[in-house]
């Protein structure tokens, strides 16, 4: 499943329904097991009819990032950790950010049996990156239950963690959860590709663009491996 809501006008990335449709197509091509593709959104127009729509809730919608209003605020995603998530997503689900390119078979990543696993090697001071996580619904409901909009963002900032929801996940769960890393083929465009001439790492299965470049940006589209994979 993925998330699509209209970002603030000044935010670095502007997402579209087309990006939801492309992500669903990449997943279908690279994950052979039977699955549903779900989008949690407040803007279903233009999303392909094969994609299930879950209406986006307003919980924590107005809480700004503790790093400033030009930084993304994704606290709404914390509701995926609630016990209610099973009603929307089923017993087991993967959460994916839109700004990624799937480049290989996802089964070795998603057929694991860990009750919770999250991407986790993108910044030395932050244990996790919320661009992708997989869980058995409700298995870490304390992430949702214990979030206090008045105090939790400040706690994560004081700990030196980056981000909004991902920072709280780290603060509440600690640093010892199972992680995907580049050794599993989960790669960072900013950290592992842009700094090395744009070459796709050997064994890469999925590449995330957690930064100023998106898969649809001219810089990314200049790379053949992006064009070969990022399409309907």
Task: Enumerate the predicted regions with their spans.
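Residues that flank catalytic or metal-binding motifs in active/ligand-binding sites
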Residues: 33, 49, 77, 96, ...
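Short, charged, surface-exposed secondary-structure boundary motifs
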Residues: 11, 15, 62-69, 125-133, ...
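Conserved catalytic core of nucleotide-sugar-dependent glycosyltransferases
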Residues: 103-173
